Amino acid sequence: MWYDKLNLLENLYVIFDVFGGYIMGIRSQFAIAVGKTSQWALKTFFKGGSSLPGKLALRIDPHILDSLAKDYQVVVVTGTNGKTLTTALTVNILRQQFDEVLTNPTGANMVQGIVSTFLQAKPAKGKKKFAVLEIDEASLSKVTEYIKPELFLFTNIFRDQMDRYGEIYTTYRMIVEGAAKSPDALIISNGDSPIFNSVETVNPRKYYGFDHQEDEEQMAHYNTDGVLCPNCHHILHYKMITYANLGKYYCPNCGFHRPELDYRLTEITHMDNVSADFVIDGNEYGIEVGGMYNVYNALAAAAVAEHYNVPAEKIRKGLGYDEKVFGRQEVIEIDGKKCTLVLVKNPVGLNQVIDMIGLAPYPFSLVCLLNANYADGIDISWIWDGNHEAFAEMNIPAVIAGGERHADMATRLKVAGIPEEKLKETKELTEVIEDIKKLPTEHVYILATYTAVLQLRKELANQGYIKGGMDRG
């Protein structure tokens, strides 16, 4: 009879479902074993790590993240600038409150790198486990195919690597679509950024931002991206601007305005080139890095901490943890020269770094290293939108232009007003390091694109100035 055949089909489906699940379980366990073994081999014989273990595990089981992340409360940090430091600060704070907080500090913020991060985790049964993951904007949607975060933290979106991301609204669509795959997850985003309030999302949202100045009618600089009202396309006005297009914005034509803030920075009590003190939601905090952009990173991390009910004293301790992050104002001593290494990758970030450097109370020399590999962004036209002209006003005694595109960097600095007698071009990093030793000042700022940072750190490690040259963190 037809219903007997139907029952047979149903029974076969159950059998294949169970058997298939068993096979998938075996595949996952085998993938994990291969990944962990390759990690051990890399650390034992090559003294370092990479995303290779994750790549191998994914080749065996494309759904391996399902198995690895299922016991974690996952927090995802994404955006153009500030991901790395915001992730580090968030991890530092949560570790004051929770026993097990996993993160990806080695620059592996794409899918295979995330898998490698989970492969490194030690078993912690019976404890509340967090994973705070920095994820590349273009990779978010791929990662959320397999991981279901409970919280997304959006830092900002600025023009960056146009050959990879396109314009800012394309990038925003990328991360909104990635977050939508976990529709119940909360998005905590920068309320001072108009783009984060430009479209409705399926996810619930909260906002952090600055509320530290009296209202004063202002307009963003004419070359600023993202200042058109998303509703009527008139130019936004501001009652307060922190930098670029961030601030207390509103549209005089249609009434579009900054949303109510859930987490508020109400005062900056001190800020220089190496530190900042401020008040968030009535509590005083400080960080051991300078610049307005880093205060935003601290505010974002504090917002996540408040969401998880971390007490203010533990937030304070986590923010004050003085361990410099890869390329984020890390200080490296080279034969008596105190070199501050800063990653730069787009005009907004560069301008914030220039503003921060301008706060230095002591004389310094400058090194600018420019590469144009895929991870840097092949299009280097962005250097012409950066305010290098400010360097000409700082009376810097010596400047080095280096990296694979040293000639382009030198041209930009000359056009900005750096005198030729103060400027030296040096392509090879071994020569750059030798030239740094001869600079006339004790303090040196090194501004470098991503792969230039990696190459410089590798060479510094080879010469014994640092450990773990190619790794971040």
Task: Kindly label every feature range from the protein language model.
Residues 81-83, 108-109, 193-194, 294, ...:
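Gly/Ser/Thr-rich loops at beta-strand to alpha-helix junctions
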Residues 3, 9-43, 48-50, 233, ...:
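ATP-dependent carboxylate-amine ligase
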Residues 4, 8-228:
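Phosphate-binding loop of NTP-binding sites
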Residues 134, 155, 188, 297, ...:
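Residue-level signal for inorganic ion chemistry
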Residues 209-347:
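Adenine nucleotide phosphate-binding catalytic loops in nucleotide-utilizing enzymes
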Residues 100, 150-151, 185-186, 204, ...:
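Residues at the starts of beta-strands that form the adenosine-phosphate
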Residues 86-87, 141-143, 163-164, 197-200, ...:
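Short glycine-/acidic-enriched loop or helix-start segments at secondary-structure transitions
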Residues 90, 94, 114-118, 298-308, ...:
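Buried hydrophobic packing segments
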